[in-house]
């Protein structure tokens, strides 16, 4: 079954959106496999966003991520990566449709509440980085009501 990495950024944590965001993924039928509340240091944030290191906004992004705790999660389910991106909405909240997390809760691109893996390979890398100890191996009793 496919997995993806989702991170609620410091603004989402500070604004009390953790439960709402988790609820959206659960209500869709995805399974939570890993969850951490963590304050990351600069080196870790730089490693997570290494692919953006040449961008002019890189330092500001790193400062934002280390400014407070984040909630890192691994979600599992059929099509979770693509569907998760749709639930999240466009990177720029002003381009996000109402009903998406960013469309409902964000205005500025620099405070866009949530991060989600954008491809299978980035999901693998991010899960390995944030959850080196692995994730919980379990199956919800609702599985048979969601999947054929």
Curated annotation (Swiss-Prot):
Any one biological process term the GO annotation gives: GTP biosynthetic process
Enzyme Commission number, as recorded: 2.7.4.6
Gene3D superfamilies: Nucleoside diphosphate kinase-like domain
Record-linked Pfam families: NDK
Active site: 115 (pros-phosphohistidine intermediate)
Enzyme class, broadest EC rank: transferase
InterPro entries linked to this entry: NDK-like_dom (IPR034907), NDK-like_dom_sf (IPR036850), Nucleoside_diP_kinase (IPR001564), Nucleoside_diP_kinase_AS (IPR023005)
Keyword ATP-binding part of the UniProt annotation: yes
Positions of ATP binding: 9, 57, 85, 91, 102, 112
One Gene Ontology MF term: metal ion binding
CDD domains in alphabetical order: NDPk_I
Cofactor requirement: Mg(2+)
Sorted UniProt keywords: ATP-binding, Kinase, Magnesium, Metal-binding, Nucleotide metabolism, Nucleotide-binding, Phosphoprotein, Transferase
Coiled-coil intervals, chain numbering: none
Presence of keyword Magnesium: yes
Swiss-Prot/TrEMBL catalytic activity: a 2'-deoxyribonucleoside 5'-diphosphate + ATP = a 2'-deoxyribonucleoside 5'-triphosphate + ADP; a ribonucleoside 5'-diphosphate + ATP = a ribonucleoside 5'-triphosphate + ADP
Function comment: Major role in the synthesis of nucleoside triphosphates other than ATP. The ATP gamma phosphate is transferred to the NDP beta phosphate via a ping-pong mechanism, using a phosphorylated active-site intermediate.
Family: Belongs to the NDK family.
Name assigned to this protein: Nucleoside diphosphate kinase
Organism: Capsicum annuum
């Amino acid at each position: 079954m496919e997995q993806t990495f989702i991170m609620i950024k410091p603004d989402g944590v500070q604004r009390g959106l953790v439960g709402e965001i988790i609820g959206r993924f659960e209500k869709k039928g995805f399974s939570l496999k890993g969850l951490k509340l963590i304050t990351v240091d600069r080196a870790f944030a730089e490693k997570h966003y290494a692919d953006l290191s040449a961008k002019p906004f890189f330092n500001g992004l790193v400062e934002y991520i280390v400014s407070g705790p984040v909630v890192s999660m691994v979600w599992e389910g059929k099509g979770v990566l693509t569907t998760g991106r749709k639930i999240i909405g466009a990177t720029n909240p002003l381009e996000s449709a109402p009903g998406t997390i960013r469309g409902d809760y964000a205005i500025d691109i620099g405070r866009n509440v949530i991060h989600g893996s954008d491809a299978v390979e980035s999901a693998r890398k991010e899960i390995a980085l944030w959850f080196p100890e692995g994730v919980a191996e379990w199956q919800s009793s609702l599985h048979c009501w969601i999947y054929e």
